Swiss-Prot record:
Keywords, alphabetical: DNA replication, DNA-binding, Primosome
Alphabetized InterPro entries for the sequence: NA-bd_OB-fold (IPR012340), Primosome_PriB/ssb (IPR000424), Prisomal_replication_PriB (IPR023646)
Gene Ontology cellular component terms for the protein in this record: primosome complex
Functional summary from the UniProt entry: Involved in the restart of stalled replication forks, which reloads the replicative helicase on sites other than the origin of replication; the PriA-PriB pathway is the major replication restart pathway. During primosome assembly it facilitates complex formation between PriA and DnaT on DNA; stabilizes PriA on DNA. Stimulates the DNA unwinding activity of PriA helicase.
A GO molecular function held by the record: single-stranded DNA binding
Biological-process GO terms, alphabetical: DNA replication, synthesis of primer
Entry's family note: Belongs to the PriB family.
Protein's UniProt name: Replication restart protein PriB
Organism: Haemophilus influenzae (strain ATCC 51907 / DSM 11121 / KW20 / Rd)
């Protein structure tokens, strides 16, 4: 339960399995980026009923601090990602939510 004085602006955390090979790039300004697809599946209780929650979400990791952690990310890695979500426009012009990682933890 959130307290009324608690300010949460844009925070998102999800645990899942990497389902697409990470793609690493470097921007013209020299910032390193790593992008991959994370798949999440879980059972959630909603209005007293169990429902399956499922999503595939693109994750983007930027900057030297987290990039080193991405070297061991492979398809099938189970990870927890904490960050913020924003909208990116795809090549086909559609808007897609992307999770920008601020923390990554490997789950055994």
């Amino acid at each position: 339960m959130l307290k009324s004085n608690l300010k949460i602006d844009n925070s998102f955390s999800v645990m899942g399995v990497v389902s697409r090979l990470p793609k690493r790039l470097k921007s013209p300004s020299g910032i390193e980026h790593c992008k991959f697809l994370l798949e999440h599946r879980s059972d959630q209780i909603e209005s007293g009923f169990t429902r399956q929650a499922w999503l595939k979400m693109p994750v983007q990791i930027s900057g030297n601090q987290l990039i080193e952690k991405t070297q061991s990310i492979t398809v099938g890695s189970k990870i927890l990602v904490v960050g913020f979500i924003t909208s990116h426009k795809t090549q086909s012009g559609l808007c897609q939510l992307v999770l920008h990682a601020e923390q990554i933890e490997f789950i055994d």
